[in-house]
Amino acid sequence: MLNIGPFTFKSRLLLGTGKFSDYDVQRKAIEVSEAEILTFAVRRMDIFDAQQPNLLEKIDIKNYTLLPNTAGAKTAEEAVRIAKLAKASGLCDMVKVEVIGDDKTLLPDPVETLKASEMLLEEGFIVLPYTSDDVVLARKLQELGVHAIMPGASPIGSGLGIVNPLNISFIIEQATVPVIVDAGVGSPADAAFAMELGADGVLLNTAVSGAKDPIKMAEAMKLGIHAGRLGFEAGRIARKRFATASSPLEGMSVVE
């Protein structure tokens, strides 16, 4: 089970709702993924205007927990305003804090992310900050009282997978809240690797929506995450420099 604040989820896959070719593909991919948490950018929708396109209009949202994110924010104050807008519309008061500090890499601004998280915690939000793989920053966010840490595997939408597994593993080892690997996942193998490292979940979007067959990829990601989690719980064998025979040598007859 994945526990975030007061919520408990069976699925460890969190799925973004953007960039799908059409609403029908989006809906089918979400259903196949069995994700229970759907994230979306508040700025991409006019959530107070029923006449405007709505990324969630073809989804039976009562079956899901919605995770609005503050994508587009460049400052802590902007992030807080976006989060409050989502909450005022009646959406879940759980929010993914995203404050971008660089337009080319889309890497998060560590100072503004820390500030926004603190402000939103004071407002009573359930806070899930998207951050880099900075181990110290992850610890400082945890000390603030955030409800989960969301370190990026690599830049958003890059599909590079986990470029710094050592830092991700350090973040996981020191964590007392769930660690959800976010951004840069490109394949089921990437998702499985994140889970093998001990992550509590994986959030992805482009890897599914940008695939040749998003529906098949959604299922593949679900299975990859499940396999990776089972592997982590089972415990992999230790790496060794030399071979170890898998068949016992004792009792073997010697052929003259």
From Swiss-Prot:
Keyword annotations: Cytoplasm, Schiff base, Thiamine biosynthesis, Transferase
A Pfam family annotated for this UniProt entry: ThiG
Recorded catalytic activity of this chain's protein: [ThiS sulfur-carrier protein]-C-terminal-Gly-aminoethanethioate + 2-iminoacetate + 1-deoxy-D-xylulose 5-phosphate = [ThiS sulfur-carrier protein]-C-terminal Gly-Gly + 2-[(2R,5Z)-2-carboxy-4-methylthiazol-5(2H)-ylidene]ethyl phosphate + 2 H2O + H(+)
GO MF terms, alphabetically ordered: thiazole synthase activity
SUPFAM superfamilies: ThiG-like
Subcellular location: Cytoplasm
GO biological process: thiamine diphosphate biosynthetic process
EC number(s) given by UniProt: 2.8.1.10
Active site annotation, chain numbering: 96 (schiff-base intermediate with dxp)
Residue sites binding 1-deoxy-D-xylulose 5-phosphate per the record: 157, 183-184, 205-206
Major enzyme class: transferase
Biological pathway: Cofactor biosynthesis; thiamine diphosphate biosynthesis
Disulfide bonds: none
GO CC terms: cytoplasm
Transferase recorded as keyword: yes
HAMAP family (alphabetical): ThiG
Quaternary organization: Homotetramer. Forms heterodimers with either ThiH or ThiS.
Family according to the record: Belongs to the ThiG family.
Protein's job: Catalyzes the rearrangement of 1-deoxy-D-xylulose 5-phosphate (DXP) to produce the thiazole phosphate moiety of thiamine. Sulfur is provided by the thiocarboxylate moiety of the carrier protein ThiS. In vitro, sulfur can be provided by H(2)S.
Protein name: Thiazole synthase
Species in which this protein is naturally found: Bacillus cytotoxicus (strain DSM 22905 / CIP 110041 / 391-98 / NVH 391-98)
Gene, per the UniProt record: thiG
